[in-house]
Amino acid sequence: MEESCLIEVQNLSLCIGDRWLVRDLSFSANQGEFIALVGSSGSGKTTLLRALSGDTPLANGQVITHADCPLPVGMIHQDLQLAEGSTAIKNALSGCLYRHSSLKTFFGFPEEEKKRAVALLQKLGLGQKLNQWTSTLSRGERQRLAIARTLLGQPSILLADEPVASLDGKWAGETLNTLKEYAKDQQACVICSLHDLDQVDQFADTIIQVDPLNHDKWEVKCNPSTKA
């Protein structure tokens, strides 16, 4: 195991009923690494991410994390899970709760946290929406807000389920670049499912792809485009 390793997956297998989704998958993710999960709809990408987060039981194998922080694993879900009756800035700041006591946040978040939240929301194109109710935001804006909230929690292992599925080309690229920068700057790792192969080629350091002829087998390979 490398010293920079944040998560190890050893001989992981997953099944739903009598259908195997994954068999004997092994890989590791290191600090600064961006990993893309690639496969057709229904191939098991979401289930695999939920298994890595601990939300789905394994049929076999193990997942070992080496992160030492208040929020070792953060997950960006497709259903977003935002607080509808709150503003964009308050939703984003809720991601910081893992790093502060409830007593401290009862009196308001520290000023540096507010500045970080505002800067990140501006970067993701939400600078003019800070005090807007979440329920009034578009699907793409809500998706970027959910990403900002998770990043503000500063997880060492960031799992993202189709994080740019609702975004147009410009914001998809900007958002994936933000995730990649986060991995480098915070010495974290990002593992996300993507369906656009151009995005995979541009951003992923490592690609984990389902075998189209043998759907429970997954291939792990380096991306020469980003490793060069």
Regions found by a protein language model. Give the residues of each.
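Conserved ABC ATPase signature
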Residues: 133-137, 141
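Helix N-cap at the start of a conserved alpha-helix in ABC-type nucleotide-binding domains
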Residues: 169-171
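H-loop/switch region of ABC-family ATPase nucleotide-binding domains
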Residues: 194-195
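Helix-to-loop junction immediately C-terminal to a conserved catalytic motif
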Residues: 53
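Conserved ABC ATPase "signature" region
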Residues: 105-129
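Catalytic Walker B motif of ABC-type/P-loop ATPase nucleotide-binding domains
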Residues: 158-161
